[in-house]
Amino acid sequence: MNKDNVKLAIAPIGWTNDDMPELGSENTFQQIVSEMALAGFTGSEVGSKYPRDPAVLKPMLDIRGIQICNAWFSTFFANGQREKTIDEFVNHMNFLHAMGANVIGCSEQSGSIQGLDKPILGDAKPCFSEEEWQRVAEGYNTLGRLAAEKGMQVCLHHHMGTGIQTTAEIDKFMSLVDERVFLLFDTGHAWYSEGGEAPMLAILKKYLPRINHVHLKDVRPPVIDQVRRDGLSFLDGVKKGTFTVPGDGVIDFRPVFKLLDDFGYKGWMVVEAEQDPALANPFEYAVKARKYIRETAGI
């Protein structure tokens, strides 16, 4: 891949999980970002342990050569929380802008079961009505406009357990929003939802012109099989090892890197692979991911 076009980041979720704070509670902010830098990454997304004052956070990252590239934002347009979502988005956007980021990754969380004790591979996930889809589209178009006014871009993170998870749901969303709304492509969630590498790559191919942020996440099919068989929740699956870093699971990332490179993708690729840090040492797995990307993507 072209080193001038692509930057590599890693998410803190491998060290400490915001949805399950007991996982990695012993890992401090300074340890996390120091290990990111030591593993060879130059970017990070934002976790719950990160200071939210740019004047405090930025110097602590600068000394380690780390930039903030994104931070998760939950939207609630489908269930009618438009004004509250937009107000909170503006504050979130201003924080990211102050940190030098230009991408804002959002997930539509209305009815989401990703944090609930419900089977993630059952039929409990939300399915939006036409009215709800229109609310979501109108809301995201508003966020896209607000971000553009700041010289930034909004992207939708398709995610297990949400109303925008499957290929069909991604297609529906992308058909309704305007050109100022982009897609955050996540290899692990695409594979998990659609059950294989071919449909995962099909999403990537179809939306290459609209993808402005990439999450690199590998999967362990035997764990996914157990999740399906035992009716486990998303978070129970995470604790058992549904996800891992690139090079440690079943996904061959070389076609992913080639598609992005051939298209001329410019932006961040973020290793975002949540698992139990007591079972998968975060620093060791960060080093493993960095080595794999160096060997397969040439960066």
Curated annotation (Swiss-Prot):
Cofactor(s) named in the record: glutathione; Co(2+); Mn(2+)
Superkingdom field: Bacteria
Enzyme Commission number(s) from the entry: 4.2.1.44
Family: Belongs to the IolE/MocC family.
Known catalytic reactions: scyllo-inosose = 3D-3,5/4-trihydroxycyclohexane-1,2-dione + H2O
This protein's name: Inosose dehydratase
HAMAP family: IolE
Enzyme class: lyase
GO biological process, one term: inositol catabolic process
Protein's UniProt keywords contain Lyase: yes
This protein's record includes keyword Manganese: yes
Database matches in PANTHER family: HYDROXYPYRUVATE ISOMERASE, INOSOSE DEHYDRATASE
UniProt-recorded Gene Ontology molecular function terms: manganese ion binding; myo-inosose-2 dehydratase activity
Pfam families xrefs: AP_endonuc_2
Keywords of the record: Cobalt, Lyase, Manganese
